[in-house]
Amino acid sequence: DRLMLLCPPQHGKSRITSERFPAYILGQEPTRDVVSASATAQLGEKFGREVRNCISSQEYRNLFPDTQLAEDSQAKGLWNTNHGGGYYAVGIGGALMGRGGELGIIDDPFATWEDAQSELVREKGWDWYTGTFYNRIRPGGSIIVIQHRMHEDDLVGRLLQQQAAGGDRWEVVELPATLEDPPWPERYDRAALERIKQISGNRKWSALYLQNPTPDDGTFFLREWFELFDPKKIPACHKYTTGDFAVTDDGGDFTEIATHGYGGDTLYLALDGWFGQKTADVWIEHTIDQFAR
């Protein structure tokens, strides 16, 4: 009765789970109440409108003739069925007084990447989940959490930590957008995903598309280990230059050249660096320049 659906952005998870699944459930059991929560109330109302319009369609009536909308309750974010069930949309942090349900859906608990990086926003969302949303799911009810990962301490991260400590057991459906096997190649083929990866950067790509968030400090290196130094006062050290060379110009792989300093077990210096998609004559000049400096 606990499901996580972790997918990359724009891969249809909301369409299936937040817009079509509630309509299906109410077609099967029109006495049920559904609570749908999203990062903003506007997004929740959008999902509610889609579910409502689906139930109003002739195609739906052909499949589920006994489930109809109550004539006196058809607002996009709050409506009932003719059998007493209904749908209520709320933003994360919103009030649920007097509202509850047998099915609770949380779809995209963070509005932006920046929100997910904020400890304050994450804490408020968690307090709302544990203190408001969770308590409105009736005994025997189900919870579905839909999102793409944004932080190792996001809602899914905390729920999985809670599970490890003996909390609710979650069925996790994870769909990483690997380049070798794109989950929706008709929309996002390998070339499209590679462009997204290049623009997003490693940390966003790992979280949003691979569902594998990494700490802001990194997995292997902590920010607190690094300090700035005055380039005019370089400590005594051994200097060496390394390079990863390519031969294409304005395309293909990058050439990276870096000069480092080593002054013992606790002193490693990044002294100089350059990268570019250039031919050999160009990066040779940059390498010589670093030697000279």
PLM features: what roles do these ranges have?
Residues 24-33, 56-60:
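Post-Walker A helix-loop "phosphate-sensing" segment adjacent to the P-loop in P-loop NTPases
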Residues 37-93:
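Conserved nucleotide-state-sensing and coupling region of NTP-binding domains
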Residues 234-262:
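Gly/Thr-rich phosphate-binding beta-strand-loop-beta motif of the actin/hexokinase/Hsp70
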Residues 258-293:
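Nucleic-acid-processing active sites and adjacent nucleic-acid-binding tracks
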Residues 117-182:
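ASCE P-loop NTPase helicase motor core
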Residues 76-132:
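Conserved RecA-like ASCE ATPase "motif II neighborhood" in helicase/translocase motors
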